[in-house]
Amino acid sequence: DIEMENTHSLDLIQMGVIPDDTVMNQLEGTVRAVILSHGHLDHIGAVPKLVHRYNAPIIGTPYTIELVKQQIEGEKKFGVNNKLIALKCGQRYNISNTLGMEFVRTQHSIIDTATVALYTPKGAIVYALDFKLDRNPVLGEPPDFAKLKKIGKEGVLCLITESTNVNKKGRCPSEQIAKNMVRDVITSYEDDKNAIIVSTFASHIARVKTIAECAHEIGRKPLLLGRSMERYCVTAEQMKMVRFPDTTSVFGNRRVVERTLRRLIKSGKEQYVPIVTGHQGEPGSILTRIAQNDTPYKIERGDKVMISAQLIPNDMNRAQRYRMFTMLKSQGARIFDELHVSGHAYCEDHYEMVHLLNPQFIISAHGGIDLTSEYLGLATELGYTLNKDFFLMANGQRQKLA
């Protein structure tokens, strides 16, 4: 573990925690803007450490910019004074005399996600990281298909697209599917006297909303516990982007969380549904500490533990989650995992995106070569040729398009 706020950017670059932007020194021209497609940490986490080097505004959707503000306020090493521009989807912004941009509404596992359209004299460059084409979202509106089609007709020079789930057949299931899965499990225990505790991504506001509403439906009070739950959910509610049931309470500070868990045990676990972090088995997270008996909240035989999140596939997460599940099961917990749908486009979603935009060139991104190369099969099927109009690139590589 490292303390991001107190660590120098060059040290973080060396550790591989944040991007190595020294490659920018080799490029001609000036950085005119830093554009953020959404508020997940792998997209905004490096902002406080890097953007002070550039005399450029930071542009994002309103929720993303609010999260960036919080990131910057927590920065201890650098003073970040870049202008922050909150741009709603559908609004156009002129970066320079020859460059314009627009956010196009899409869906992902965090609210206020956008696909970026950068307008150049040679055509649009569309940055689609990350996205899914959910026509029936739980929160927010469906993707702006009309705008994507319009951009395609006007001419797209290049599509830079995520590749995370391009190897999965069909279309990515709607968030409504996850809502039904979660509701099916929670409501089936309406008369149960055992505890129900749920863990999900704190940034997945639509999912947290679903869990809170299902808890309220069976007469239990939703409790959002942990600093990240507080940060993401309170911010969204203050911005009127979500409304949780009136019975919902939020506690972020660790000592307050401990007191809340102690009070919960005294008044009866069957009256509440704690919604917590820790679905990956992360050390120090609330669910992991509960599994280790490090909190006042004790698991008893028959208690229900729901995991509304997918395992992020790496060896450390697998080992940590296995250890956590083993401890929970040894205490008698009933575990329901994988109550989840992805926030990343599947193969047929990518197929639709390419047909909407009809780009001259495609660059697959977001993942190692094992993921980005999966896009090659689809690109070939669509008439693109490797190293001619479809490119597999590594960080720091350059490709001339026009």
Label every PLM stretch briefly.
Residues Y346:
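Conserved donor sugar-nucleotide recognition element shared by glycan-biosynthetic enzymes
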Residues Q26, I85, K150-I151, K266, ...:
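Structural motif
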Residues A56, V156-L157, H350-G367:
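Proline-aspartate-enriched helix->loop->beta-strand connector
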Residues R171-S308, P313-R334, L339, D349, ...:
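Hard-cation-handling environments
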Residues H38, S163, H366, A394:
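Residues that line or immediately flank small-molecule/substrate-binding pockets and catalytic motifs
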